Amino acid sequence: MKFRRSGRLVDLTNYLLTHPHELIPLTFFSERYESAKSSISEDLTIIKQTFEQQGIGTLLTVPGAAGGVKYIPKMKQAEAEEFVQTLGQSLANPERILPGGYVYLTDILGKPSVLSKVGKLFASVFAEREIDVVMTVATKGIPLAYAAASYLNVPVVIVRKDNKVTEGSTVSINYVSGSSNRIQTMSLAKRSMKTGSNVLIIDDFMKAGGTINGMINLLDEFNANVAGIGVLVEAEGVDERLVDEYMSLLTLSTINMKEKSIEIQNGNFLRFFKDNLLKNGETES
């Protein structure tokens, strides 16, 4: 179908936004809009400039016969800081205190607007790690994993603590829960991922990191690689952390059960933003 340029720009933008991290040949757009590649290239230049100015992301152009254009979702550091600050204020409500030093997160994990921003933030930080799969453990981490995977355009695999007949043969391991020191079991369907996959692990809450450490050990059974670890909230003051390299959005500093108070601080996500800026030779925005 032949488009006017204004209509072509709208449709082209929408297509890119709904196909993140997908390399699309210019020939595809040229045939789709019945327009010359030179015209498509001009359109993409306009879209790239707008995406970068508005903090939507960027367009990566790959030259050559097998090349094309790829939309990479990005979140500006200033936007990430503002979002995490607002989220932290919401979680600092004393009514969220649960027995055992936990915080009620279910309502947060049910808000599409929050999940979308968390997913984009994770995807932005780990965009250059060539992620093949996002992994999480049932059940609270599932919405976060799908949110990140939607921006990375990769599948989600869910580790379970009980076997399900519908998943076929599984690989199971025993792991030690870091917070309770209890031996537990987790399993993953054998056909859930390819050997050698680069995996982004996502979870909602981390104390000592026993569950995440268990997922890392489970990945060894698939000869898969840990490409990154992202958690929504980590607990501070843990005697022994079983996971070293991870990104957290928020840190649960203290919970005073007697006085019904919570102290929430920013996690370490800013370090990852700054590392990416240094790696790419960019400046803060």
From Swiss-Prot:
5-phospho-alpha-D-ribose 1-diphosphate binds at A138, T139, K140, R160, D203, D204, F205, K207, A208, T211. Pfam families: Pribosyltran, PuR_N. InterPro entries: PRibTrfase_dom, PRTase-like, Pur/Pyrimidine_PRTase, PuR_N, PurR_Bsub, WH-like_DNA-bd_sf, WH_DNA-bd_sf. The keyword Transcription applies. Induction: Autoregulated. Residues 1-73 are annotated as: DNA binding domain. The binding of PurR to DNA, and therefore the repressor activity, is influenced by interaction with the effector molecules 5-phosphoribosyl 1-pyrophosphate (PRPP) and (p)ppGpp. PRPP binds to PurR and reduces affinity of PurR for DNA, which inhibits the repressor activity and induces transcription of the target genes. On the contrary, (p)ppGpp enhances binding of PurR to DNA and repression of the transcription. PRPP and (p)ppGpp compete for PurR binding and allosteric control of transcription. Residues 74-285 are annotated as: Effector binding domain. GO terms for molecular function: DNA binding. Changing D204A: Reduces the affinity for binding to pur operon control site DNA and abolishes the capacity of PRPP to inhibit binding of PurR to DNA in vitro. The keyword Acetylation does not apply. Changing D203A: Reduces the affinity for binding to pur operon control site DNA and abolishes the capacity of PRPP to inhibit binding of PurR to DNA in vitro. DNA-binding transcriptional repressor that controls the expression of a number of genes involved in the synthesis, metabolism and transport of purines. In response to a signal of excess adenine, represses the transcription of the pur operon, which encodes enzymes of the purine biosynthetic pathway. It also represses the expression of the purA and purR genes. In addition, controls the expression of several other genes or operons, which encode enzymes or transporters playing a role in purine nucleotide metabolism. Contains an N-terminal DNA-binding winged helix-turn-helix domain and a C-terminal regulatory domain (or effector binding domain) resembling phosphoribosyltransferase (PRT) domain. However, the PRT domain lacks enzymatic activity and serves a purely regulatory role by binding effector molecules. The ppGpp binding site partially overlaps the PRPP binding site. Binding of ppGpp significantly alters the electrostatics of the effector binding domain by creating a positively charged channel different from the apo protein. Homodimer. Belongs to the purine/pyrimidine phosphoribosyltransferase family. PurR subfamily. This is Purine biosynthesis transcriptional repressor PurR. It comes from Bacillus subtilis (strain 168).
